[in-house]
């Protein structure tokens, strides 16, 4: 197992799933902190943009003064569900992009409403066994740029991608006991 004890990982905690991400990060040995301010953001080696409601998160990023700092944040980022939407540089339906850090286009709520949430075994590039992916009002990536690597698809739709030190997934890895997605994210710190 890798040693992540020297790293501090932030989880943006303006809205959305935070404690589950913190627990998984700490399980792997890294220090995890909730990020609500610029001073907290400046302490981290990498950042998780959690699930939640992307439009509400954008408003809170602006009101907290974090929006511009997040746009210029150049360390590794893992965006899950709404976090994927925040990372996209294009959203279907004409909605303006949020942080626009990844060359991807995203369809929001692509798999239906809350009642249509599901878990499936997902094959992820580089993983020997399937991953128990939990989809809750999940988006998917409808278009990718040439610099984006597809890590997983479900029913022909891209649901996990990588661009440089950015990872974006449509599902919630923090809602399972399987830590491989978070470990893949933490490995970005060693590259």
Curated annotation (Swiss-Prot):
Catalyzed reactions: aldehydo-D-ribose 5-phosphate + D-glyceraldehyde 3-phosphate + L-glutamine = pyridoxal 5'-phosphate + L-glutamate + phosphate + 3 H2O + H(+); L-glutamine + H2O = L-glutamate + NH4(+)
Keyword Cytoplasm: no
InterPro entries: Class_I_gatase-like (IPR029062), PdxT/SNO (IPR002161), PdxT/SNO_CS (IPR021196)
Positions with a binding annotation for L-glutamine: 52-54, 108, 136-137
Record's keyword terms, sorted: Glutamine amidotransferase, Hydrolase, Lyase, Pyridoxal phosphate
Active site (catalytic residues): 81 (nucleophile), 172 (charge relay system), 174 (charge relay system)
EC nos: 4.3.3.6, 3.5.1.2
GO MF, one example: glutaminase activity
Cited Pfam families: SNO
Pathway: Cofactor biosynthesis; pyridoxal 5'-phosphate biosynthesis
One GO process term, biological-process aspect: pyridoxine metabolic process
CC per GO annotation: cytosol; glutaminase complex
Oligomeric form and interacting partners: In the presence of PdxS, forms a dodecamer of heterodimers. Only shows activity in the heterodimer.
Function text: Catalyzes the hydrolysis of glutamine to glutamate and ammonia as part of the biosynthesis of pyridoxal 5'-phosphate. The resulting ammonia molecule is channeled to the active site of PdxS.
Family according to the record: Belongs to the glutaminase PdxT/SNO family.
Protein name: Pyridoxal 5'-phosphate synthase subunit PdxT
Organism expressing this protein natively: Actinobacillus pleuropneumoniae serotype 5b (strain L20)
């Amino acid at each position: 197992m890798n040693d992540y004890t020297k790293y501090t990982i932030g989880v943006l905690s303006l809205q959305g799933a935070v404690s589950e991400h913190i627990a998984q990060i700490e399980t792997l040995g890294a220090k995890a902190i909730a990020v609500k301010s610029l001073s907290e953001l400046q302490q981290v080696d990498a950042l998780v943009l959690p699930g939640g409601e992307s439009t509400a998160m954008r408003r809170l990023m602006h009101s907290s003064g974090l929006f511009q700092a997040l746009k210029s944040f150049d360390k590794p980022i893992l965006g899950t569900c709404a976090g994927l939407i925040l990372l996209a540089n294009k959203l279907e339906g004409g909605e303006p992009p949020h942080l626009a850090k990844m060359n991807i286009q995203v369809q929001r709520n692509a798999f239906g409403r809350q009642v249509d949430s599901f878990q499936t075994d997902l094959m992820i590039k580089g993983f020997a066994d399937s991953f128990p992916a939990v989809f809750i009002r999940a988006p998917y990536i409808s278009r990718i740029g040439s610099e984006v690597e597809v890590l997983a698809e479900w029913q022909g739709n891209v649901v996990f991608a990588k661009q440089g030190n950015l990872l974006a997934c449509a599902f919630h890895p923090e809602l399972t006991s399987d830590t491989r997605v978070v470990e893949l994210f933490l490995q970005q710190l060693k590259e």
